[in-house]
Amino acid sequence: MKLSDFDFDLPLELIAQNPISKRDESNLLIASTQQYVKTKFYNIIDYLKEGDLLVFNNSKVIKAKLSLDKNITINLNQRLKDNRRATNDDAGRLKSIDYWSAFAKPARKLKVGDEFYFDNHKIIITEKLEMGEIKIKFELANISVFEFLDKYGEMPLPLYIKRPERQKSDDERYQTVYSNIQGSVAAPTAGLHFTNDIINKLKAKGVQVAFVTLHVGAGTFMPVKTENINEHKMHTEYCSITPETAAIINKAKKEKRRIIAVGTTSLRTLESSGINGNVNSGDFETDIFITPGFKFQIVDMLLTNFHFPKSTLFMLVCAFAGFKEMHELYKYAIEEQMRFFSYGDATLLYKKV
């Protein structure tokens, strides 16, 4: 299929610039086969049933945006594998070393070997790659990289959120209430609508919950640039499924209960690990690219926000719920003035069979 097959006209005013005042008061579009139902998110309880299994991504967004100086910013992308170690500096003080990939703006102002200081901590440019990507080395004085980012970094809101400045509330609202494993540089946004109260009410109804981890990388915002979508190269992201979670999911599959992925990240994690209809536990990386024709093994329903035209995520929902059906659904959502992208509204999709 061609990239242009996944295009549609999106009015810019529908790109949500701020979260709605209460998480669960965003709109929810139920895309059943019979009709569309537009409701408030807190009513999702009415559309799930006893025995359903909700699978969340528990990755936590880190403050991945750093100002190296007044003219250069970087957005961390991904922690490089097997990179962490502790050593001592010349004075015998403990120093932690950490390696990451990042995107620099403007990258042309950087060269390999450049050093930037944050009090007694240091960032070194170790490699320059294509399209503004760089590799960096953290040399930190007796703190972890996450403690460093909490002190010196900013929440990495997407570029399509165009505000004069960040708001303190973003530190809370661009984070799910259940996130607890640090590593994402963008939010798994379908989960932003959930409150602890809604999760507790779903459990009381008999809906089961489980958690996987996918650390969202900055590559999630990279546009597809090839007209032949099969030529697009996906970014890799770290995933993890515990043996306990795999057992819960496989039991639900065996009992033919519905598995509902909360967000495309949860879906990509589950489908990446699926073999012969079962989920395997473990830590792994995925570059899975889901397009129409993909054979889903694990997920029955998908809760997700509304996505960009010509994006890999719009291709994913077309693969899951139908190409024609998703173009029609998005046309309806635009007519209904629903809010798009990270701080926008949600839709509950059923797998097309």
Swiss-Prot record:
Subcellular location: Cytoplasm
A Pfam family this chain is assigned to: Queuosine_synth
Keyword Cytoplasm attributed: yes
Domain of life: Bacteria
Involved pathway(s): tRNA modification; tRNA-queuosine biosynthesis
Reactions it catalyzes: 7-aminomethyl-7-carbaguanosine(34) in tRNA + S-adenosyl-L-methionine = epoxyqueuosine(34) in tRNA + adenine + L-methionine + 2 H(+)
EC number: 2.4.99.17
Cellular component terms per the entry's GO annotation: cytoplasm
InterPro entries: QueA (IPR003699), QueA_dom1 (IPR042118), QueA_dom2 (IPR042119), QueA_sf (IPR036100)
Coiled coil, from the record: none
Major site of localization recorded for this protein: cytoplasm
Sorted UniProt keywords: Cytoplasm, Queuosine biosynthesis, S-adenosyl-L-methionine, Transferase
GO biological process: queuosine biosynthetic process; tRNA wobble guanine modification
Protein's UniProt keywords contain S-adenosyl-L-methionine: yes
Single Gene Ontology MF annotation: S-adenosylmethionine:tRNA ribosyltransferase-isomerase activity
Family under the similarity heading: Belongs to the QueA family.
Quaternary organization: Monomer.
PANTHER family referenced in this protein's UniProt entry, alphabetically: S-ADENOSYLMETHIONINE:TRNA RIBOSYLTRANSFERASE-ISOMERASE (PTHR30307:SF0)
Family matches, as NCBIfam families: PRK00147.1 (NF001140), queA (TIGR00113)
Role summary: Transfers and isomerizes the ribose moiety from AdoMet to the 7-aminomethyl group of 7-deazaguanine (preQ1-tRNA) to give epoxyqueuosine (oQ-tRNA).
Protein name per UniProt: S-adenosylmethionine:tRNA ribosyltransferase-isomerase
Gene source species: Rickettsia bellii (strain OSU 85-389)
